[in-house]
Amino acid sequence: MYAVIKTGGKQYRVAAGEKIKVEQIAADVGQEIVFNEVLAVGNGAELKVGTPLVSGATVSVTVLAHGKHDKVSIFKMRRRKHYQKRQGHRQQFTELLVNTIAG
């Protein structure tokens, strides 16, 4: 069984027992979270697609860790003007373990 959930402005296809990294969520490590924004639920050949959400469907997850992704380097330059600008960014994430999918 799998589901498509929406969190942090993105959509993720998840299955029970999977680990996923999502945009940072304000929750403690070990805390259980329930996602109600389920866009689709599938089980083999059967697929329920919501309009826009599947009513009564939930996905239960546990927070495993918080962290930062690898650094992304940004370099801007204007030719012949001696303008150079360097910038770096590390996006924060939350690692989740999918416990159950109901719906």
Curated annotation (Swiss-Prot):
Gene Ontology MF terms: rRNA binding; structural constituent of ribosome
GO CC list: cytoplasm; ribonucleoprotein complex; ribosome
Listed Pfam families: Ribosomal_L21p
Entry's Gene Ontology BP terms: translation
InterPro entries: bL21-like, bL21-like_sf, Ribosomal_bL21, Ribosomal_bL21_CS
Record bears the keyword Ribosomal protein: yes
Keywords for this protein: Ribonucleoprotein, Ribosomal protein, RNA-binding, rRNA-binding
Subunit structure, as described in the record: Part of the 50S ribosomal subunit. Contacts protein L20.
UniProt record similarity statement: Belongs to the bacterial ribosomal protein bL21 family.
Function: This protein binds to 23S rRNA in the presence of protein L20.
HAMAP family from the UniProt entry: Ribosomal_bL21
Protein known as: Large ribosomal subunit protein bL21
